[in-house]
Amino acid sequence: GKPICGETCFKGKCYTPGCTCSYPICKKN
């Protein structure tokens, strides 16, 4: 399946590929 962006991001980093930090949650870029 495709990665889901929704984890909390710390220090501007998202660990899910294709996601960027839109504090405090990762969003698809």
Swiss-Prot record:
State its role: Probably participates in a plant defense mechanism (Potential). Binds to and induces leakage in phospholipd membranes, particularly ones containing 1-palmitoyl-2-oleophosphatidylethanolamine (POPE). In vitro, displays cytotoxicity against cultured cells. Not active against Gram-negative bacterium E.coli ATCC 25922 or Gram-positive bacterium S.aureus ATCC 25923 up to a concentration of 64 uM.
Disulfide bond entries: C5-C19, C9-C21, C14-C26
Sites of the Cyclopeptide (Gly-Asn) crosslink: G1-N29
Q: Which InterPro entries match?
A: Cyclotide, Cyclotide_sf
* Record remark: domains: The presence of a 'disulfide through disulfide knot' structurally defines this protein as a knottin.
Protein name in the entry: Cyclotide mela-4
* Keyword Nucleus part of the UniProt annotation: no
Q: Does the keyword Transmembrane helix apply?
A: no
Q: Which UniProt keywords apply?
A: Cytolysis, Disulfide bond, Knottin, Plant defense
Mind telling me how this protein is modified after translation?
A: This is a cyclic peptide.
Q: Which GO terms describe its biological process?
A: defense response; killing of cells of another organism
UniProt record similarity statement: Belongs to the cyclotide family. Moebuis subfamily.
